[in-house]
């Protein structure tokens, strides 16, 4: 009897693990979309290393104009001092995180969606390259998230045939 229970429990754990992997792959293939008509109002704080990584990845130079690129925002697991952490990724590289207060309001607003369990939101990012000194340049990222995160659910568009309508 105990052996049967252990076999069933182990089988259930494997099935749950496979489900989580398949769910994550599905979420990456079909992220939520954000209404592209929103203004670029949310600035992502970038550290020096993130700026250098972004400049190398996208081969950014100072003489370029503003660049528009697709980015993903995705909720991460909670940390000791932060319950809601939302990362910003470009080309599968984490470049920064949303500010904690904005991230908390955004997560609470989208709590009834798959975003809360890890489904990313695809949106446009505006990258501006500026010159820090004669030999060094930096960059700034603005996202077209709504200025008020408590209205975000009005702008999220689901991206598959089952969820073709707005949230």
Give residue spans per PLM region:
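Conserved active-site motif detector
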Residues: 1-167
